[in-house]
Amino acid sequence: MTKSPSRLAEMRFQMTALSAQLRWGTNLELEPVRRREGELLVCGMGGSGISGDFLQAVAAAEGRRTTVHKHYGLPGWAPSLRPSVVAVSYSGNTAETLSSWEEARKLGLQVTAITSGGELAEMAALAGEQLVVIPRGYQPRSALGFGLSALLRVAAQAGAISDPQPSLEEAAHLADSLSGPKGEGIGFASELASAMGGRMVGVYGSVPLTQVAAYRWKTQTNENAKRSAFWSVLPETTHNEIVGWDLPQGLARRRVGIVALRDRDEHPGVSRRFEVLEKLTADRVTWVGEVWTQGFSPLGRLISLVAMGDLFSLELARNSGADPMAVDLIDRLKEEMHTSADSAPEEPSGF
């Protein structure tokens, strides 16, 4: 792989749009829908599916529940509990999400589509179901703000969460201040990436909030930096995974770097576990650094970590000369799936 400043600059430009994308959602006008029944079920894969994970965390902070489905069809309980379904696919051609849409329609469930076009938009329009069209022209993983803000607005309309407008505004401000053109997080992300070096990236989050951001960091590292990475969640990690760092001759310390994502409202027990875990494993694995949430609302705090993780992944790409735009193996997998199984064509960029 060769270093491509223009490709890196293009992805960097797309990432700086996070703030504007979130603000786009505050001005979104939604079509009225009939009264929804049951809990909200979000169906989507990759970057679309992760918007459901963010919604789930925001709803949980309000004492409410939503469910995310990242598979073909619908969960086995859907026919009896009859959820309201939101199908999210940036391209509108994601095979698993189209399968979920078709199953929901067969069951006569209330369905909303969030997409930039493709088959999903066509089916929603033909069926007369609620359709939220988001702007095209982005790499799907750099269009999180569009899908997430639209999903939050739909969820609020359904009564699954409270009005997200204030938290969207806060999140947009944080995204701009951290990862905008003059973002204050750029220098720290560069230092973090340099400290990581060529190690495998491990990202530790915690229940209930930063675990979602940890997964985003992991997937952005995979796609932008072309780097193997993993994520894990406290407190569960301290009951199993940590034993795996007890390798001979400092093997893990040389090859693995851990970034801890911390939140000011994390459980005191989790805070203590982070401290003790680092103390006990400091000679076994490299703790590269901590990144703390900023902001007040659950959404704002999550977006602050998203902004930093996006910057971190791009700095890793810069340091190694990786092309952050390409996802060749994903493209090849989808071509093989389409050729061998007569499946719907999917978007070429991962979700």
Predicted feature descriptions by range:
Residues 7-9, 13-14, 20, 24-33, ...:
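Active-site phosphate/pyrophosphate-binding segments
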Residues 35-178, 263-266, 271-285:
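Glycine-rich phosphate-binding loops that contact phosphosugars or nucleotide phosphates
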Residues 84, 145-152, 219, 242-248, ...:
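Short, surface-exposed amphipathic charged segments that create phosphate/polyanion-binding patches used
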Residues 69-72, 227-238, 287-296:
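A generic structural motif
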Residues 1-7:
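Polybasic, low-complexity association/targeting segments
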Residues 323-351:
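Short, small/acidic-rich helices and loops at N termini and domain boundaries
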Residues 21-24, 150-154, 212, 223, ...:
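Short, hydrophobic/amphipathic alpha-helical patches that form generic packing surfaces
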